[in-house]
Amino acid sequence: LTLAYAAAKILDSSIDIKKLGALSLRGRCEKIASNLYVDVGHNELGAKAVAKKFSQEEFGGKKLTLVYNSFLDKDFKAVLAALKPVIEDVLLYHYHCEGRELGGELINKALNELEISHREFEPSDMNDIKEAKNGKIYLAFGSFHLAEAFLKEYYASKGL
């Protein structure tokens, strides 16, 4: 946003960012279904913002099931530590991204060190998310690649 504002300011010096209304950005804590949110956060700052949102009264202290994975070059331990206060457990979601390696065993190690319950994401998990009958709130959190892969699978499971 800052870069776009700087470019717009060059083209029209009368532009004032303070006059910009509230933004609704796709993939930023976006509610997909009654029990499913997606956030394209991939760093500690994004994780802290999400933790703050899910700490609010509207969620009544309910903990999330985090659908997560991260690229190897990210500080996933800091991300997970920031999210720990609002998550019950983690489902490790695997996807392919050409030329980028996922954190793999190092994410498992970080989760163990942080004492966060976790396991691999399974097809039955997508059914649970889709059916929304188990009372859980799910948050798919990670890169644009994770969000895209997860949402494709989610919508395909719904026949969309």
List each language-model region with its residue ranges.
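Nucleotide phosphate-binding/pyrophosphate-handling subdomain across enzymes
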Residues: L1-D89
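Short glycine-rich anion-binding loops that position phosphate/pyrophosphate groups of nucleotides
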Residues: H42-N43, L72-D73, H96-C97, F144-L146
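Short glycine-/acidic-enriched loop or helix-start segments at secondary-structure transitions
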Residues: A47-K48, F76-A78, E101-L102, A149-K152
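Generic C-terminal helix-cap and adjacent flexible tail
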Residues: F59, K152-L160
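Short hydrophobic segments within beta-strands
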Residues: V67-N69, Y93, F141
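C-terminal helical cap/extension that packs against the catalytic core
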Residues: L80-I137
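A glycine-rich beta-strand to alpha-helix segment
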Residues: D125-Y155
